[in-house]
Structure formats: structure tokens, C-alpha cells
């Protein structure tokens, strides 16, 4: 039986705690499907070694793993701090400067050179994912003087957020282009674009990748308030989204995050685009062997709401328990998935189809979903070139695995981001998919009485009809 216990895909950020070959093999066996490299940290040499280790660990374990490069984008950060962490106390004076200095408890540098022009007295600034709040009191040519409103500890290179202030900067920076070029040259499968505002930001990234001769799977990170207003355009341009709750939770009131998360998932599910839910999912496991009850519930609710992936950040990158964190995600997912209520995408489709163009892969997807309301097959086998039909079916979050068979290795890697899809690379693209399915099921010792098979036109068989077949394994002759 090749299928794991959990259908939710696990994305793990790789860092000093997890970048060794042995640890990578361990967390792959524990359930990691996608390895995330945060290009806001580290250098190209270290990332190159990590990529090589991930590929080697994937080969050694015999398990498919996709690699995602998370581009920094125009993220504003403070600079280096001596004797960190520093402690900021309410009513303290604290200065942000565009000068390159080593920071201390009174002053730190910032990466955004236009900060003094962008803010004015009375504006609120946030550091370290909103844990530290400042109010601007005075602005000079190179310095922004502030009063500490909410204090806390601060370390080097933590983020700076300016909610509600239009900075007029592109989401795809020159440094992003350098990172993209490196990632493509080193065989990275997917790219995460930070601080996306509109679909045009994704198009700029895609055009840059095409200029380099590549077509990566592109994840739009939703972490700005403005992105929610342009979500349809972003989803049309991107291959999937990440709900990056750290920066998003600073950009919008924190009490609105839960509803925003649900709405983002619903829209992405409708459009058949995979969703990654990220930030602080098991934050306490950075230092503790077990998560809090609230964290376990957070992961569970994201799965119940329709996420395709759940993601670890510091827990797996620099925490004390990277392996235990991955195993815990897998445990929670396996326990929660059987309790997921039927997702209501079908009713949404039926509303949308009134007067609109009907897409064939939507019809196939709803037919498969309706069939699985009556039977429980061993798997749904979907031959696919681009992965579109498989993702269209996967949005229903079915109770059985979808076996997506493709002649494209890229498609197999892309499908690692989709809930409940098991990718199989079949370079020859057989003439008889029914015979292939029976042989594959037997070779993998997949148990069950029934299998659902979908077929459609292909480059080899352009006139083949779209159809769905239920195969009774008990009636097949050897």
C-alpha cells in the first residue's frame, strides 16, 4: 500500500536544525512533501548544499519531495544588533535609521531607504510580526524617531511592517531576480512570491522565469491587506497561494485573521488552486516537545476549512524538535481528515455554471465527487499531462487518494502541493490506461474492490472522448 495515512501535504522550512542529510531523510520519512528554502536567510552556497542534500535524501528514501524557493520580496527588515536580544520597554525612545550601523537598545538600521519619506508623526510601525509596536514621533532625513507602545525582545533582521501605508514598491525586486536565477539553475521546483498585491506581480515573476527558460510552480504569498481585494486576479495568475499569517496578521486586525483565512481557502478551492496555511502552526514546538492544545486545534481547523498544505517555519528550520514537529503535523492531519465534512464546491459550481462556460475538467471533477458519495474505491486514477484535471478533482478533498499519472516529471512535482494526490511518473503514456491501472495496483499491493478511472484526449490520442469508468477489480481476469 503506497499511500500515507494523511492526505494533507506537509511543507517544512529547512534551516540549521534540519539541513543535514540524516535529518532530511528522517523528516521525509515522517511525512515532509515540500521542502521550503527561505531566501531571506542564508546565502547561495548554503542553499546549494541544502538542495543537494534534499535531492539525495529523496533518492535515499525513495520518496518524492518538491523544493520551493521563497523569495524575499520587498520585505523591510531591521539590521544586525549587537548583544541581542535587546529589550524594548513601553515609553522608551527608539530610532530606526537608514544608515548602516550595528544596532543597540536605542537605534537600529532598516533595509528600506525611503522610510523617512514614507512615514509621518503619529504613524504606527510594527516589528517582529507585530509583537513590538512603535509610534512615530519625529522624522529626520535619515532617521525615524519613535516611542515604544508595546515592548518586547528584538533580534537581528526581524521584519518591519507599516500597515495601511502605500510604499509604492514592486513585489518582485532585483534581488528576487538574482534568487530566481539561482533557484532555476539549481533545479528548484516552485517559487514563492512575497508581498503580492495584484496578479501583475505574479506575471512579472512568471515572465522573468520564462526569460530564464523555466516554468516554475508559482505560489503567491497573501500577506498584504491589499492582496485580498485583488484575490481573483492573483489566483488566475498564480498556481497556488500561501496564507502567510505572520505579516497578514499585522496588516489587518488580528481578530479578523480567522475569517480571512476561511475566505481565502474557499476562493482558492473554488478555482482549483492549492492553499498553504503558514506561520506559527506549531510555534511552541520550537522549544517544546509537544504543541499547545490551541496549536493542535489551529492545524486541525485549517484542514477542516480546506487547506491543501500546512507549513512549519522556525519549528523545522531552527527549532529543537524538527522531526517531532513534522511527525506531529502528520498525526494531527491523519486524525482530522476522516472528520472533514463534504466541501460545498459542487453547489458553488452549479451556481457558477448558470449562463457561464462549462469547463470539461469541472464536469469530470463533479462526476467523480458524486460517484464517491456512493462507493469507496481504492483510488481515483487520473492520467494527466498538466495536472489540471487532478487538481480540479482534488479540490473536493476526497476521502480516497487520487493517483495522478503523468509523463511530465514537472507535473508530478507540482502536484506535491495538492491535497490527496499521489504522483506517479509514467514517461511512456500507455495506450490502454485500464490495463496500466490494473498492473500498477497489483505491483503496489493496493487493496480494494473498485477503482475509478478518468480518461480524456491526449497528444497521442487527440480524439479520445472524456469519460469516467468504474473498474470492478474482483471481475478482472488475470
Mark where each language-model region is.
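Non-catalytic helical/linker scaffolds that mediate oligomerization, partner binding
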Residues: 1-478
